Amino acid sequence: MTDSNDPVVRGYLLQLIGEEGIEMIENMPEGEVTDEQIAEASGVMLNIVRRTLFIMNENNLAVCRRERDSSSGWLTYLWQLDLSDIESHLVKEKKRITKNLEIRYNFEVDSVFYTCPEGCVRFEFKEASKCEFMCPACGEDMMFEDNSVMVKKLRDRLDALEASS
């Protein structure tokens, strides 16, 4: 099984299922188990266990098997974690993040910004000129924003992601 203490895996799972979901995974019994057994073993509320299992199933990180009780006709859902494919999920997530950072980086590089000194708004030059460089919220004169620090942070983050390939 994949180590849920690996910071990259843990960060991905945290984003996907939250802290209670991670707690559930860490305390989940081995093999096929019911959601009630998972809730009892992990101490996580049953509705959160079910929500987490459905999210993990949608992302192919958990497998569900239905079993019908022959006497009552009731269905029992048996769950088992399958984190064997998490590496491909991490690669997809990295690509998504890289794409979004590149879009933001290009936007920051290609634009000139004006901001309200009170922090009300941040506009590109075109929008700022439409309101005559006056903040529409508070009426203060908007100031040119040097976004070079933001551009550098975005570039550094993109470089770090590329270096981790």
Curated annotation (Swiss-Prot):
PROSITE patterns per UniProt: HTH_TFE_IIE (PS51344)
Q: Where is the HTH TFE/IIEalpha-type domain?
A: 5-87
Q: Which GO terms describe its molecular function?
A: DNA binding
Q: Does the keyword Transcription regulation apply?
A: yes
Q: One matching Pfam family, short form?
A: TFIIE_alpha
GO biological process, alphabetically ordered:
regulation of DNA-templated transcription; transcription initiation at RNA polymerase II promoter
Which pairs of positions does the record mark as disulfide bonds? Answer: none
Q: Which UniProt keywords apply?
A: DNA-binding, Transcription, Transcription regulation
SUPFAM superfamilies, A to Z: Winged helix' DNA-binding domain (SSF46785)
- Give the protein's biological function: Transcription factor that plays a role in the activation of archaeal genes transcribed by RNA polymerase. Facilitates transcription initiation by enhancing TATA-box recognition by TATA-box-binding protein (Tbp), and transcription factor B (Tfb) and RNA polymerase recruitment. Not absolutely required for transcription in vitro, but particularly important in cases where Tbp or Tfb function is not optimal. It dynamically alters the nucleic acid-binding properties of RNA polymerases by stabilizing the initiation complex and destabilizing elongation complexes.
Per UniProt, subunit arrangement is: Monomer. Interaction with RNA polymerase subunits RpoF and RpoE is necessary for Tfe stimulatory transcription activity. Able to interact with Tbp and RNA polymerase in the absence of DNA promoter. Interacts both with the preinitiation and elongation complexes.
Q: Let me see what the UniProt entry remarks about domains.
A: The winged helix domain is involved in binding to DNA in the preinitiation complex.
Similarity section: Belongs to the TFE family.
Per its record, how is this protein called by name? Transcription factor E
Classification lineage = Archaea, Methanobacteriati, Methanobacteriota, Stenosarchaea group, Methanomicrobia
Encoding gene, per UniProt annotation: tfe
